[in-house]
């Protein structure tokens, strides 16, 4: 019986196997690799590697099915193996045999057979690589001559066929590099025959051949020539690879043996070339040598004798065990429909001949006839080999009868009902008699439109329910005048479009002005989407230029360009040196002196015309020895005194002396908007005395008078400025006192007695200045530069020093100094007057900028700055004949203290700029003295702390008088213009001796900031899950009927109550020199899954023609699963120094509990944090994903009884699973939970329920700059999607145990199980078998692994907005902080048990016995 069943199975398998097509779907690539050191890439040279794509679908292909790939113009496969497997993911789904065409067919083929690994639920696809060599000719056989025309040199299209499907690819073939006019040779190895086909073509004669001899022979006797496989002919040309393309007969004589072959020919026409080819068998296919005869005479040419020898080292196919065997190729005609090549069975140890058969089909002709009937019949009239067979196809056709009826439709329909068992078909014509309809349209949740028609009986009312998906939505965003955003939804009817109108406020606008090359102005507006910023670009033409030329004190010319903003005017200032001056003095009739200056343009000469009144006349009367009187007039130049000397006879005389002095005080003040300038000067202690004794040896009288007029020019500068934004105060006060002392002596030595006069006066000067500045700006930068110059020989200079200090750093400093000397040379006569004028320009520019980019910023700064200034004026003059010496020294100093304190809160960038300008002071003065100043000395005490000391010692005796002065203040920040203040005339008479020492020090000190930060993250997640299930039992009882299929349905309800809670606490501590910051946060989330349902359907098949009684009960039990998830994570970041982070590794563990199995997960993580030195804001993110799977077990019981002795196959499937869940989440952050169950299709008999969940959480913490007074910490939590992939690999083992103590072990690659039970014993009567018990156990080997990787990259943008001293610094730099890689491993042993029992009772009758015996003999 077993043999009979085996034969039946084989018969059914062969009967169901079929030929399929379309498996190969593409040629992905076709590349060449040089397998034999060939000179060019020819199509016939191995190896061409063809990569083909294939696809096998288990729904259309079955094990045993065959498919064939035909490869035209392919000579052979160059692989060493005989077949190739179509493999996907390591599984073989088909095996393909190689059939090389060689010299037998013009194509090669690949015949494939599907194996048992392909099931209906599998679709496999992949690629296969085939090493091949193409056939482009090489012999005179019909196969080679046909294939010699397949390709040409260059680009070709290679096409393969899989049934009706054509696969093509373009490829480039290179032409032969051998000269076609010479002799041509080639050899090809044929693996199936283990022989080489060698070709020899005679050299070319363009006008034809008169005669010739050609052939080849073995050189050493190691090559055997097969004289039975020889082709001789003449070819009309050769192809691109030097192979014959035609073969025609001609006159020749052949001589052939196993050692050589040759022919002698005559009279070959022009355009043709003789050739000869034969099969040879070298003893070594890889190396052999042939000698060639080459004698020929071309028409109208001389006889040529050029024999040659070639050594062949060609390509050999590695066909093991095939050398030295006689191989015979035969052709046989068969009844198949296609041509094939096959190898007959061959045993090397017994058989000596290996036969290759070329199977060619018998040609057939088909005749089609018809008749009235049901079935199509085929009959074949066979024919012997060599004739044509006839196939007669008798096709049936049916007659029809027509039936007409009414129906509720709107059109007339005609339906033909074909009768499968009779030759008369029925044509049903339905005439419309429609019912009225009521149509209802409604929305539903699906994405497509559904129409349901409820048709009532004839003459009733039909209902049409149209279900439409929700309308698509078109969202339009537009601007409006309000300051807030709003959304309006307009809902249309079904099949319409809903509109969502989003109204956004207008974007803010940023305007940028720039120059361009055009002569006109233009404005371009760039509008962005809502919540963006619009840009307005104003392009202005370049400003016009105004050129001003002025004189300056340098000896060279210079040009300065001042560029203003658009729509302004640019200024070009050309500074030229002063012109030389020519002075001319002349008398005039007026009583006063005047000076006229004629100024010319630059590079000219100025003229000064001095007009003086006539000199006064001094009359002197003196005695002389004469007795008469006489008068003498002495005339001097301008500004002199003419003398009239009267000589009288000797008489007595007397003289008088007059001295006069005066005191005066000067003061001046100037007032400007938003600033105050106070300056006062007082001069005290002015006195003079005169003591002039006169004596003479002889009586005499004399008169002496002294008149002194002093005038001087003094240039000085003083300015105070203030700026105010929000609140600003600048105050300044100066106090000056002066003490001057001077002594003047006169003497006369014209007589024997000494006459002298002494005048002494003194005064003191004390100057003091103080300033106070208060401002809310976070940075103040002050720079003052004072300068004045005189066109004569006087100058004024000052030294300013600004020192600013903060608790952490010195931010800025500016020091400038200048100390000139001035010498005034007077005329020879005394007294003298020198006039000069000075115009000085001073500009002070103050700029403060604050940039804040944060939601909330609080800054406090308390810097202090001091300002010291000293100025000196020195003048030196001398006169002759007097040797008097006068020195002048003036000095003043003041200090400024700046203590700003502010608090700033901003939500956007803030920029504050303070421009301030002060310029122009003019003084007019005159001086008449002789003075000297000691040379000052300056030394640098230390270069490291920038300390300088200036020492000088002066002795001053001076007299200064000023007639008028003006001071001018100008503002350029939209102020009130310029203010000119006049000062009254004043005079200073002083005598002073002083030692002055000035020390300027600048010390830059920085207090390092030490910050200590500690971040602790302790998330704790506890999860618990419990579930229980209940199911219903169903049974079906069928008796005494024919059953084809029974459908069982069962519905179970799975109630589940899962809860998950998560607690996360975060604490942060920052310690810095400005204070401590503690911040903390907590996170709690709870998720619960309330209920889900499972729908199960089962199909029981029974195929029997006899009575069957079947009862089935099933009990589905879902294991009680408790899952506990504990997650602990600790992350610590310590910051002990600025901008330096260190981290400690953290550990991550998870423990799952499922029955008695343990699932563990251990993660070791090491975090690396790198920051740049300027990073003060750190963002740390962490992300965790958790998942778990749970499996269920199925317990069932089946019992059945058959009242038949025929086989009955019963298979029960439980296949479909669906799950739905409700979630309730409470969280301060964002927690996502998901639950899903995967349905397993039929026919597996086990149920696999998977429950997975994932949580996603991202935390971001921002730390503010540690350099500011008040640090700020911000924490944010956002949701970050993460994809996590887990792969579970299982190796279950299934064991079945029977009551006869037999056992079987089956390895199954998956958890799919099927059991087929067959009971049949027709020879026993009234046999009862209740002992069949099957136990199925499944053990999952703990070799499962899950690998997951998580890479987290965080980028932080830092902003430093600390306030140090008088300025603000900002820095922004992206920095990659953290990169984490985590690897997890799971080990999860699970146990699933299946138990079943069955019992059967057989009571066969005589009829059943008879049927069984008949079936037995039939099989």
Curated annotation (Swiss-Prot):
Q: What is this protein called?
A: Agglutinin-like protein 5
The record places propeptide residues at 1399-1419
Source taxonomy: Eukaryota, Fungi, Dikarya, Ascomycota, Saccharomycotina
- The UniProt annotation puts the region (Disordered) at 652-752, 864-885, 926-966, 981-1035, 1051-1093, 1134-1177, 1211-1252
Composition-biased stretches, type Low complexity, lie in: 928-942, 951-966, 993-1011, 1023-1035, 1051-1078, 1212-1230
Subunit and interaction comment: Forms homodimers through the tandem repeats. Aggregates in amyloid-like structures, with self-propagating secondary-structure changes, amyloid-characteristic dye binding, and induced birefringence.
This protein's source sits in the domain of life called: Eukaryota
Instruction: Name the glycosylated positions.
Output: 665, 919, 1301, 1326
- What GO cellular component term, any one, is given? cell surface
Modification after translation is described as: N-glycosylated and O-glycosylated. The GPI-anchor is attached to the protein in the endoplasmic reticulum and serves to target the protein to the cell surface. There, the glucosamine-inositol phospholipid moiety is cleaved off and the GPI-modified mannoprotein is covalently attached via its lipidless GPI glycan remnant to the 1,6-beta-glucan of the outer cell wall layer.
Pfam families registered for this protein in UniProt: Candida_ALS, Candida_ALS_N
Primary subcellular site in the record, as a coarse category: membrane
Entries under SMART domains matching the protein: Candida_ALS_N
Keyword Signal in annotation:
yes
Signal peptide coordinates: 1-17
Summarizing the function annotation, the protein's role is: Cell surface adhesion protein which mediates both yeast-to-host tissue adherence and yeast aggregation. Plays an important role in the pathogenesis of C.albicans infections. Forms amyloid structures, essential for cell-cell association and cell-substrate adhesion to polystyrene.
Q: Which family does it belong to?
A: Belongs to the ALS family.
| Topology relative to the membrane | Lipid-anchor; GPI-anchor
Q: Which InterPro entries match?
A: Adhesion_dom_sf, Agglutinin-like_ALS_rpt, Agglutinin-like_N, Agglutinin-like_N_N2, ALS, Fibrogen-bd_dom1
Entry annotated with the keyword DNA damage: no
């Amino acid at each position: 019986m077993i043999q009979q069943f085996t034969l039946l199975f084989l018969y059914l398998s062969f009967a169901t196997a079929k030929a399929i097509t379309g498996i190969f779907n593409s040629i992905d690539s076709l590349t060449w690799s040089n397998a034999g050191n060939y000179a060019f890439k020819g199509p016939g040279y191995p190896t061409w590697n063809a990569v083909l794509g294939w696809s096998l679908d288990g729904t259309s292909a079955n094990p045993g099915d065959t498919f064939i790939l035909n490869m035209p113009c392919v000579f052979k496969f160059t692989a060493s193996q005989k077949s190739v497997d179509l493999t996907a993911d390591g599984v073989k789904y088909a095996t393909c045999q190689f059939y090389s065409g060689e010299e037998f067919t013009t194509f090669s083929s690949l015949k494939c057979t599907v194996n048992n690994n392909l099931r209906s639920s599998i679709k496999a696809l992949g690629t296969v690589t085939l090493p091949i060599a193409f056939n482009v000719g090489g012999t005179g056989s019909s196969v080679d001559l046909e294939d010699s025309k397949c390709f040409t040199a260059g680009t070709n299209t290679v096409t393969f066929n899989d049934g009706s499907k054509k696969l093509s690819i373009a490829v480039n073939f290179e032409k032969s590099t051998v000269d076609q006019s010479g002799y041509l040779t080639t050899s090809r190895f044929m693996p199936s025959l283990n022989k080489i086909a060698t070709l020899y073509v005679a050299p070319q004669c363009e006008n034809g051949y008169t005669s010739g001899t050609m052939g080849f022979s073995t050189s050493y006797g190691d090559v055997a020539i097969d004289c039975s496989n020889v082709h001789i002919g003449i070819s009309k040309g050769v192809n691109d690879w030097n192979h014959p393309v035609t073969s025609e007969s001609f006159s020749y004589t052949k001589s052939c043996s196993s050692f050589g072959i040759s022919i002698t020919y005559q009279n070959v026409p022009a355009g043709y070339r003789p050739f000869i080819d034969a099969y040879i068998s070298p003893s070594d296919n890889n190396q052999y040598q042939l000698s060639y005869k080459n004698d020929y005479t071309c028409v109208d040419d001389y006889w040529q004798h050029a024999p040659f020898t070639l050594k062949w080292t060609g390509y050999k196919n590695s066909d093991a065990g095939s050398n030295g065997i006689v191989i015979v190729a035969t052709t046989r005609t068969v009844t198949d429909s296609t041509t094939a090549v096959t190898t007959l069975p061959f045993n090397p140890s017994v058989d000596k001949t290996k036969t290759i058969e070329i199977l060619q089909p018998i040609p057939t002709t088909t005749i089609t006839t018809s008749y009235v009937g049901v079935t199509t019949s085929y009959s074949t009239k066979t024919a012997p080999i060599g004739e044509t067979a006839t196939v007669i196809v008798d096709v049936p056709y049916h007659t029809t009868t027509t039936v007409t009826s009414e129906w509720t439709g709107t059109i007339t329909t005609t339906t033909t009902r074909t009768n499968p068992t009779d030759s008369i078909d029925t044509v049903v014509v339905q005439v419309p008699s429609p019912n009225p309809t009521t149509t209802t349209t409604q929305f539903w949740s699906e994405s497509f439109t559904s129409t349901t028609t409820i048709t009532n009986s004839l003459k009733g009312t039909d209902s049409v329910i149209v279900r439409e998906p929700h309308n698509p939505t078109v969202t339009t965003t537009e601007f409006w005048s309000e300051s807030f955003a709003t959304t309006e939804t307009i809902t249309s009817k079904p099949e319409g479009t809903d509109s969502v109108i989003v109204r956004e406020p207008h974007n803010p606008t940023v305007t940028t002005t720039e120059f361009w090359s055009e002569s006109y102005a233009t404005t371009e507006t760039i509008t962005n989407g809502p919540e963006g910023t619009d840009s307005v670009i104003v392009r202005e033409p370049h400003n016009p230029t105004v050129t001003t030329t002025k004189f300056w004190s340098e000896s060279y010319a210079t040009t300065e360009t001042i560029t203003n903003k658009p729509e302004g005017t640019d200024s070009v200032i050309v500074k030229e040196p002063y012109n030389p001056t020519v002075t001319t003095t002349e008398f005039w009739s007026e009583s006063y002196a005047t000076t006229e200056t004629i100024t010319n343009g630059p590079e000219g000469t100025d003229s000064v015309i001095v007009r003086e009144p006539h000199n006064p006349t001094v009359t002197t009367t003196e005695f002389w020895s004469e007795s008469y009187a006489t008068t003498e007039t002495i005339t001097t130049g301008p500004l002199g005194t003419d003398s009239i000397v009267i000589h009288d006879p000797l008489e007595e005389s007397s003289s008088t002396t007059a001295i006069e002095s005066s005191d005066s005080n000067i003061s001046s003040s100037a007032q400007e908007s938003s600033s105050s300038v106070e300056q006062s000067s007082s001069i005290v202690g002015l006195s003079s005395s005169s003591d002039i004794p006169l004596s003479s040896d002889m009586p005499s009288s004399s008169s002496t008078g002294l008149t002194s007029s002093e005038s001087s020019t003094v240039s000085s500068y003083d300015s105070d400025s203030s700026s105010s934004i929000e609140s600003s105060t600048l105050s300044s006060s100066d106090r000056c006192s002066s003490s001057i002392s001077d002594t003047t002596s006169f003497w006369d030595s014209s007589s024997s007695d000494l006459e002298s006069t002494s005048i002494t006066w003194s005064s003191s000067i004390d100057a003091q200045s103080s300033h106070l500045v208060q401002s809310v700006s976070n940075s103040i930068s002050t720079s003052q530069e004072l300068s004045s110059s005189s066109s004569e020989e006087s100058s004024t200079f000052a030294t300013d020093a600004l020192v600013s200090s903060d608790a952490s750093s010195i931010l800025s400093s500016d020091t400038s100094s200048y100390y000139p000397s001035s010498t005034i040379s007077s005329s020879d006569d005394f007294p003298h007057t020198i006039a000069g004028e000075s115009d000085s320009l001073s500009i002070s520019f103050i700029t403060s900028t604050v940039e804040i980019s944060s939601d909330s910023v609080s800054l406090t700064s308390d810097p202090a700055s001091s300002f010291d200034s000293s100025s000196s004026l020195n003048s030196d003059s001398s006169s002759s004949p007097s040797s008097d010496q006068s020195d002048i020294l003036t000095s003043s100093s003041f200090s400024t203290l700046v203590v700003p304190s502010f608090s700033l809160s901003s939500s956007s960038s803030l920029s504050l700029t303070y421009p301030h300008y002060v310029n122009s002071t003019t003084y007019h003065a005159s001086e008449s003295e002789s003075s000297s100043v000691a040379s000052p000395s300056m030394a640098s005490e230390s270069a490291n702390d920038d300390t300088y000391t200036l020492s000088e010692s002066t002795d001053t005796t001076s007299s200064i008088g000023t007639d008028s002065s003006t001071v001018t203040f100008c503002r350029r920040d939209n102020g009130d213009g310029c203010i000119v203040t006049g000062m009254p005339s004043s005079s200073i008479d002083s005598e002073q001796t002083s030692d002055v020492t000035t020390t300027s020090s600048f010390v830059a000190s920085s207090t390092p900031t030490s910050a200590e930060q500690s971040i602790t993250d302790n998330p704790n997640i506890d999860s618990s899950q419990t579930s229980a299930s209940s199911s219903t039992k169903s049974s079906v009882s069928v008796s005494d009927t024919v059953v084809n299929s029974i459908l069982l349905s069962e519905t179970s309800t799975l109630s589940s109550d899962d809860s998950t809670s998560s607690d996360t606490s975060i604490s942060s501590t920052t310690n810095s020199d400005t204070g401590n910051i503690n911040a903390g946060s907590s996170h709690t989330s709870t998720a619960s899954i309330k209920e889900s349902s499972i729908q199960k359907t089962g199909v029981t098949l029974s195929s029997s023609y006899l009575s069957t009684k079947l009862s089935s009960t099933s009990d589905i039990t879902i294991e009680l699963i408790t899952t506990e998830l504990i997650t602990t994570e600790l992350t610590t970041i310590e910051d002990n120094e600025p901008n330096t982070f260190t981290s400690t590794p953290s550990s991550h563990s998870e423990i799952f509990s499922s029955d008695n199995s343990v699932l563990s997960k251990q993660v070791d993580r090491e975090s690396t944090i790198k920051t740049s030195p300027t990073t003060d804001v750190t963002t740390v993110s962490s992300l965790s994903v958790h998942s778990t799977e749970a499996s269920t077990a199925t317990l069932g019981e089946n019992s059945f009884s058959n009242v038949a002795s025929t086989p009955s196959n019963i298979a029960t499937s439980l296949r479909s699973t669906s799950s739905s869940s409700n979630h309730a989440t409470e969280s301060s952050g964002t927690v996502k939970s998901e639950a899903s169950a995967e349905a397993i299709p039929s026919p597996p008999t086990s149920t696999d329920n998977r429950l997975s969940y994932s949580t996603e959480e991202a935390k971001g913490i921002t730390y503010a700059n540690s350099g500011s007074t008040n640090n700020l910490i911000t924490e944010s939590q956002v949701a970050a999607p993460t994809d996590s992939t887990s792969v579970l690999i299982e190796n279950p083992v299934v064991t079945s145990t029977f009551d006869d103590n037999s056992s079987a072990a089956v390895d199954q690659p998956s958890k799919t199980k099927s059991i087929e039970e067959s009971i049949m014993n027709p020879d026993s009567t009234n046999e009862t078998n209740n002992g069949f018990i099957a136990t199925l156990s499944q053990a999952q080997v703990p070799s499962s692994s899950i690998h997951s990787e998580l890479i987290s990259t965080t980028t932080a943008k830092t902003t430093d907005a600390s306030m140090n001293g008088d300025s603000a610094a900002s820095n922004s730099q992206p920095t990659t902080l953290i990169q984490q890689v985590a690897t997890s491993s799971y080990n999860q042993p699970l146990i699933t048990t299946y138990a079943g029992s069955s019992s059967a009772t057989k009571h066969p009758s005589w009829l059943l016995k008879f049927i069984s015996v008949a079936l037995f003999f039939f099989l």
